[in-house]
Amino acid sequence: MKKRALISVFDKDGVLELAKFLRDRDVEIISSGGTYKYLKENNIEVKEISEITDFPEMLDGRVKTLHPLVHAGILAIRDNKEHMKTLEKREINTIDYVVVNLYPFFEKVRENLSFEEKVEFIDIGGPTMLRAAAKNFKDVVVLSDKKDYEKVMNEIKENNCVSFKLRKTLAGKVFNLMSAYDAAISNFLLEGEEEYPEYLSVSYKKIQDLRYGENPHQGAAYYSSTEFDGAMNSFEILNGKALSYNNIKDLDIAWKVACEFEETACCALKHNTPCGVAVGENSKEVYLKAYDADPVSIFGGIVAINRKIDKATAEEMVKIFLEVVAAPDFDEDALEVLRTKKNLRVIKCKNTPQAKNYMVTVDGGILVQGEDNKLANEYKVVTKKEPTEMELRDMIFGMKVVKYVKSNAIVVVKDGVATGIGGGQVNRIWATKEALERGKGGAVLASDAFFPFRDCVDEAAKNGIKAIIQPGGSIRDEESVEACNEHGISMVFTGVRHFKH
């Protein structure tokens, strides 16, 4: 029985080689629209789909392959006598290969196009053929990914057929693709309508397999959103090895912290926790301030600066071991200096962080929440003493940092530098003591949540703290305010909590 292949692709890379390979094996090629013209122009013997259906393309190409003569040829089960009798009666030929890739909705939805223009890139005929062929994979070889063309050709060369195992894998890839494609369309159409829809569909594409996860015994891979360009799916590696699982997680937080600030800012980070954060006039100044805040923890850490890095900054950075240095750009002479460290990963971050929903898996489900991107409802002074202008700036600085520290979290600040960071403690007084121990000489203290008792204020007073900022909201707020008044400390309530679990 003569075999037939239906080829209809938007991305034509590799399709000529595949079509020629099939024609050399006497497989009849059927095609439509632009693919038909492309194959014909390249001297591939091909039939237009309208020759099979006796029905022309219509509605500006919206209807080309949606026809029973096409889909019956794909869906007929070859060892089902009734199916084959029906095909014979209707003079329908079987289709044994379906080679289809889709309109580039993933790419177009991210471009600056009108709603109507984006809708036109929603493919209908392609998914319908792919799903039909994938359902009948026992009898039909379905190719939705150009990377699989060679695998299929190799099996045919070696065995004169495509194995059941590969057919099944290719069918699975179709439904995997369709799941992501439909999710992207769904999210596009529901954007701004339902923040938390009944069914959660997300669309991510694998960028790379990672050597391992958090630890060597854990497998891992990195997936990129198909729906928007965030900071972590658009960076460029300018030096060093590929990023690890831990590198990517750490870089994400370090870059977010640095981008919290309009002024030049640096975040040094280790194990997903900031260890030094500073703002200032230039990249060298903020790097040195962040380094001085904790010269021990920064070793082997990640550094992100929200401005172009110059040679003077790079010369300071290469004095110690760093895993990653990230910035929006680098001077050429700065890159030359950084590249003297062969294993130092130098990352150009092209985009600022996007405020999208945050997801975390639990056993049997996913929790979804909005990003913590609201700093305060107000800055309400609740004590007799008011903070100075500089203290208020440091308070706001502290709140921008503390929301990235695991709760319970305290940050001590002086002159635009996080001099002490205490986090991940199961009670607030321990976090306070940790931050104060590291941040001796700090003037301002920021807390991610309210003080349940006055003990944190008393501890802060012992260590010279002059101003405190916190959300407020405890039934014992008055005790903390009274303690501040006793010690001559100003206190500001924001009304916004920043737990990080």
UniProtKB/Swiss-Prot annotation:
Pathway(s) this gene product operates in, as recorded in its UniProt entry: Purine metabolism; IMP biosynthesis via de novo pathway; 5-formamido-1-(5-phospho-D-ribosyl)imidazole-4-carboxamide from 5-amino-1-(5-phospho-D-ribosyl)imidazole-4-carboxamide (10-formyl THF route): step 1/1; Purine metabolism; IMP biosynthesis via de novo pathway; IMP from 5-formamido-1-(5-phospho-D-ribosyl)imidazole-4-carboxamide: step 1/1
Pfam families in the cross-refs: AICARFT_IMPCHas, MGS
MGS-like domain location: 1-144
UniProt key word Transferase: yes
PROSITE patterns, alphabetized: MGS
EC number in record: 2.1.2.3, 3.5.4.10
Catalytic activity: (6R)-10-formyltetrahydrofolate + 5-amino-1-(5-phospho-beta-D-ribosyl)imidazole-4-carboxamide = 5-formamido-1-(5-phospho-D-ribosyl)imidazole-4-carboxamide + (6S)-5,6,7,8-tetrahydrofolate; IMP + H2O = 5-formamido-1-(5-phospho-D-ribosyl)imidazole-4-carboxamide
GO biological process: 'de novo' IMP biosynthetic process
Keywords in alphabetical order: Hydrolase, Multifunctional enzyme, Purine biosynthesis, Transferase
Paired cysteines (S-S): none
Keyword Coiled coil: no
MF-aspect GO terms: IMP cyclohydrolase activity; phosphoribosylaminoimidazolecarboxamide formyltransferase activity
GO cellular component, one term: cytosol
Record text about domains: The IMP cyclohydrolase activity resides in the N-terminal region.
Family of the protein in this entry: Belongs to the PurH family.
Alphabetical list of NCBIfam families matching this protein: PRK00881.1, purH
Name of the featured protein: Bifunctional purine biosynthesis protein PurH
Organism this protein belongs to: Clostridium perfringens (strain SM101 / Type A)
